Amino acid sequence: MAMRPQDRYKSTTAGAVSANRNYKDTVFRMLFSDKKNLLSLYNAVNSRDYTNPDDLEIVTLENAIYMGMKNDLAFIIDTNLYLYEHQSTYNPNMPLRDLFYISSEYQKMLDQKSLYSSSLQKIPTPNFIEFYNGSDPVCDVFEHRLSSAFEHLSGEPKLELIVTVLNINEGHNALLMEHCKTLREYAQYVAKVRKYTADMSLNEAVECAVDECIKENILADFLRKNRAEVISMSIFEYDKEEEEKKLRKAEYEAGEKSGIQKAVLNTARHLLELNLLSLENISRATGLSIDELKKLQQ
């Protein structure tokens, strides 16, 4: 039997690769850990027409956990390695995370091969895709670049990693949704959960969304088979998304407050340097106390 291209990149560590189904699983990851669904998603993203799920090999690393985060799905097809990530919040740090993940993938693939030989060690071509369905408005397609994180970058970066982000909220990327029924129905399910959370508790909203989807034949077989697990994961995902929103809001407000305070201090210093107003008048204008103004004079 002829060797498939991806068979050349089998991990050298037994039991090191499989679909990620245990670490803080999500509905998206659970859906697309199924090779048939994953192949359909790959075909839609890449405008391909593969029909045999065995052409695709899932190689998600079970032990690739960094700072409490884990790669969602990794797979090889032909000589290409794809890292798929699902995000429900805006995250410009995905290129750095993917850099960690891809390094670990390559390390496993080449574990018993010499990197000191005179022969070039071939590796599958990496591709990085993020599927975003957060509530912050974003374009249908955009990119995150690792070089955006480099401080004092001069000229072209010597290292780059580009993550293509696809907005998979309902109403976005119509052509992609048209070619992947599972992705389209997943977007419909998420939209229903969000709609119902406006009027009822999260638990009730998720159960109502699941029931309605089954009734409308949206992911019906999947939801019937995995009802309890989907409800539990959806509640966890939504709670996590809301907590991350609160954290970002707090960080923004703290930064905004800090910026306002700096502006007040700069104004006070300028007025003191002009020496046109009394300390009392400057205090009234800036809201700073006399003692604070005296410290600025020192």
Question: What is each stretch, according to the model?
Answer:
Residues 1-298:
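Elongated, amphipathic alpha-helical interaction scaffolds
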